[in-house]
């Protein structure tokens, strides 16, 4: 019986208790939660449901808890339900109900943990979307790892996810990029507002190789040639880097297409027609404060050029026209203002602002030998995704980016993430899977098979703790999806690995020497198989490998 199963049983029991006494069943929350007590002596799970609803039905919490406990203990799978404190319920499962968790994992296999909370929902997940003016830096690396993991998690809950990269090939940064390439081709320093670094020189050399005549072209044609070829070369490099990192996209959407197709102009005219734009100081402004933004936003500047938000507005319209129910944007720490403006733009078109979600990620810092490693894209000393992977590998790079909440900054200690010890979180989790794989191989060599028919024999404390931890996994995946928080799965996997290592230290899994195999050995092998499956499932959602040996 998983926590979700128990919560469902608990709600049904509480509803029956209230109905039998003529009390209002509607006061019960739609879904209940049960928690694992900090002290295992208090039981397997605890709930405060009696304290939540007692006052609403005119009784006291302990009395209501007593009614629920009496009814609950009569249910299959419940060993005991005891009242504690002001009205808590501490619940123990019987051994068969605990063992059923292991059976459910073995039966579900790679689908264990999947759900349907987002079934049929069309979700556009836009992430990375780095400017094609340089390699992907650490901030983009974080979004690549987190975004890809989130896409996997949303899909595991039934979401129809489209991973999208918004290719910023329109605007002043592209002009600065092309001028920087021309300067490099001439052997001159980069423009003051341009980009520098070895990659600029490399791309400039590639342009010269493809178009030996480029330096003889008129200035405007020359810049356009450097722009077109340079941007394509840079974007090809970005896509290859992401692919090597395990990240691929379903759609690469070109910002410039919004302007060339007239979509931006059409969106602006539509807003003018609806009265959601006003003219002031020679510019056109969106009345975004009418829709909850902290200030009105310039859409068309006084020089007649479109502000960046104009493209954002047209892009959102494009997404909705493609039938997406939810548009998730993953943006950097300097984009807080985009939350209000994107939601306001949606509302201005008569759309539901809740179709827009914006996740803001914080900074990533690199530390080596206790000293921060500085980065600056424009100075040409940027720390890139490729640099990080070269230093600590793909798995560690993805894991370190995912395991922290996106609203907190990360300090990546290169010394820590290259350790082959329990101090390194990804090693700790992967080692648990590798150890379990070794046990499976050794059992096969002994001709010993797992048997889930006698799981009630698993009575050691560490066995019960491991089983209960396995049972938490579906709820963790559901929470990670609904809260858009992939780090919950990484932290859970560390908890599961810890529970497994403690079990391994306390229980002999395979017979030793001339010892005969017993039903306990076979039951423990079943528990090991279930643990291995859950570790593999969780690592797959993070895009991290589950090694068979280390």
Swiss-Prot record:
UniProt xrefs under SMART domains: Arg_tRNA_synt_N (SM01016), DALR_1 (SM00836)
Entry's Gene Ontology BP terms: arginyl-tRNA aminoacylation
Subcellular location field: Cytoplasm
Superkingdom field: Bacteria
Catalytic activity: tRNA(Arg) + L-arginine + ATP = L-arginyl-tRNA(Arg) + AMP + diphosphate
Matches recorded under PROSITE patterns: AA_TRNA_LIGASE_I
Keywords noted in UniProt: Aminoacyl-tRNA synthetase, ATP-binding, Cytoplasm, Ligase, Nucleotide-binding, Protein biosynthesis
EC numbers on record: 6.1.1.19
Gene Ontology MF terms: arginine-tRNA ligase activity; ATP binding
Entry's Gene Ontology cellular component terms: cytoplasm
InterPro entries in the record: aa-tRNA-synth_I_CS (IPR001412), Arg-tRNA-ligase (IPR001278), Arg-tRNA-synth_N (IPR005148), Arg-tRNA-synth_N_sf (IPR036695), ArgRS_core (IPR035684), DALR_anticod-bd (IPR008909), Rossmann-like_a/b/a_fold (IPR014729), tRNAsynth_Ia_anticodon-bd (IPR009080)
Broad enzyme group: ligase
Motif range ('HIGH' region): 130-140
Family of the protein in this entry: Belongs to the class-I aminoacyl-tRNA synthetase family.
HAMAP family named among the record's database cross-references: Arg_tRNA_synth
Matches recorded under NCBIfam families: argS (TIGR00456)
Subunit structure: Monomer.
Protein name: Arginine--tRNA ligase
């Amino acid at each position: 019986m998983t926590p979700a199963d128990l919560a469902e049983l608990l709600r049904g029991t509480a509803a029956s208790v209230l109905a039998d006494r003529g009390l209002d069943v509607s006061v019960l929350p739609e879904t209940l939660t049960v928690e694992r007590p900090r002290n295992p002596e208090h039981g397997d799970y605890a709930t405060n449901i009696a304290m939540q609803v007692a006052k609403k039905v005119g009784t006291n919490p302990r009395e209501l808890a007593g009614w629920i406990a009496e009814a609950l203990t009569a249910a299959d799978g419940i060993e005991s339900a005891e009242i504690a404190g002001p009205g808590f319920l501490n619940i123990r499962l019987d051994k068969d109900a605990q063992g059923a968790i292991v059976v459910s994992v073995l039966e579900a296999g790679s689908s264990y943990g999947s759900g349907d909370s987002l079934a049929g929902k069309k979700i556009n997940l836009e992430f990375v979307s780095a400017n094609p003016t340089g390699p992907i830096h650490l901030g983009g690396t974080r979004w690549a790892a987190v975004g890809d993991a989130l896409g996997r998690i949303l899909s595991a809950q039934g979401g129809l996810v489209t991973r999208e990269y918004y290719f910023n090939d329109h605007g002043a940064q592209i002009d600065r990029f092309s001028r920087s390439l021309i300067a490099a081709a001439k052997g001159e320093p980069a423009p003051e507002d341009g980009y520098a670094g070895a990659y600029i020189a490399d791309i400039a050399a590639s342009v010269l190789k493809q178009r030996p005549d480029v330096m003889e072209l008129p200035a405007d044609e020359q810049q356009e040639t450097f722009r077109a070829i340079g941007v394509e070369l840079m974007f090809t490099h970005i896509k290859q880097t992401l692919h090597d990192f395990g990240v691929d996209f379903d759609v690469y959407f070109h910002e410039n297409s919004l302007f060339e197709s007239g979509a931006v102009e059409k969106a602006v005219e539509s807003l003018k027609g609806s009265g959601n734009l006003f003219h002031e100081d020679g510019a056109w402004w969106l009345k975004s404060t009418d829709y909850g933004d902290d200030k009105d936003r310039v859409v068309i500047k006084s020089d007649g050029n479109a502000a960046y938000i104009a493209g954002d507005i047209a892009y959102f319209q494009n997404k909705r026209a493609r039938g997406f129910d939810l548009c998730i944007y993953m943006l950097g720490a300097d984009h807080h203002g985009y939350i209000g403006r994107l939601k306001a733009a949606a509302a201005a078109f008569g759309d539901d602002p809740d179709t827009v979600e914006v996740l803001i990620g914080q900074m990533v810092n690199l530390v080596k030998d206790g000293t921060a490693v500085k980065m600056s894209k424009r100075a040409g000393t940027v720390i890139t995704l490729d640099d990080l992977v070269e230093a600590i590998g793909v798995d560690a790079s993805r894991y370190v980016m995912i395991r922290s909440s996106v609203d907190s900054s990360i300090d990546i200690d290169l010394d820590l993430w290259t350790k082959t010890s329990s101090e390194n979180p990804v090693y700790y989790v992967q080692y648990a899977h590798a150890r379990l794989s070794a046990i499976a191989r050794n059992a096969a060599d002994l001709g010993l098979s797992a048997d889930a028919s006698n799981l009630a024999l698993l009575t050691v404390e560490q066995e019960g703790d491991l089983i209960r931890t396995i049972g938490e996994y579906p709820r963790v995946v559901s929470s990670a999806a609904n809260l858009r928080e992939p780090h919950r799965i990484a932290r859970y996997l560390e908890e599961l690995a810890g529970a497994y290592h403690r079990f391994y230290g306390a229980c002999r899994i395979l017979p030793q020497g001339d010892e005969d195999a017993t039903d306990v050995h076979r039951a423990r092998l079943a528990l090991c198989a279930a643990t291995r499956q859950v570790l593999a499932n969780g690592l797959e959602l993070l895009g991290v490998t589950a090694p068979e040996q280390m």
